[in-house]
Amino acid sequence: MRCFVYVLVCVVASVSYSRAQLPGAGGPGVFPGGVPTIGPVIPDPTRTETCAKFWVQEGDSCYLFDSGAFLRQVAASRPVVVNNQDGLFQAAANMYCGQMHPNATLVTVNSLAENNFLYEWAVRMMVEPEPVWIGLHVGPAGLWQWYSGEPVTYTNWEGMVAPRAELGLGAMIFDADIIAQMFNNQVEITPQWVPEHGRNDRHSLICEYHPSGMTAAATNAPTTPPMATAPPMAATTRSPVMFQNNPGNLVNRLTGGRFGGSLLHEIPRRQRMRPSNYRKNPYFGIQP
């Protein structure tokens, strides 16, 4: 009997200790120094790095890849909970960037090199595919513009066709679709941009700011985008590859496409004029 009581006491103590390690499992004092919080990064004057804490420098910019989530406590007697675990709408995401660092906005992508850097940097950190807001959106004047105010000199729209500027539209990157293969299913994460209404869904985000003295101040006037894209591809008569009918593993052979990522670009469900119907056709239409 004594042995049973001893074991029971040990089990209860172990469960209590485990609960104490969980965020929000108790009030202040459970964690050394109180409950951890995720809030704006306060500039540290003693910091020697160019970018603020948690930000990464590439070229003349500092970037932050963020889920948009933060911790809050509804009441002193209630546990700490995570807000916005599914991300933020685009306008809220841009405001969030400004809270994370002065003068920061959703990222402005000015070149293919910058686009490819963001693709490789962010995708390496993803546990699962996650669409991400960038700063391109349709402003009050009905024109595509960046939240930073910089002119639109480069775009990388999926399909190489700029979508019609409609109020409320924004741009996201890293849209993903499942690609059916012979031995397993893989996910194609596109480095090209996809239009999405800013309040349709919540996404993660990439923020950007330029350290003082590294770039000229941006202008805030909306600009009419030239919609520059990569040079047009040569005309081809090849028909779309039906991947499940092809005996070869094409994804392992076709890597490093002109837009970054794979040379295989799956026709997205939302895109018109696709060679095969994603929902009705048992085979996925693949556009080499």
From Swiss-Prot:
PROSITE patterns in UniProt: C_TYPE_LECTIN_2
Question: Pfam family example for this protein?
Answer: Lectin_C
Q: Which UniProt keywords apply?
A: Glycoprotein, Signal
- Residue ranges constituting the C-type lectin domain according to the UniProt record: 93-163
In which tissues does this protein get expressed?
Spines and tube feet.
Secretion signal span:
1-20
Glycan attachment points: 103
Q: What does this protein do?
A: Matrix protein of the sea urchin embryo spicule. The function of the matrix proteins is to direct crystal growth in certain orientations and inhibit growth in others.
Official protein name in the record: 30 kDa spicule matrix protein
Organismal lineage: Eukaryota, Metazoa, Echinodermata, Eleutherozoa, Echinozoa
What is the gene name?
Answer: SM30
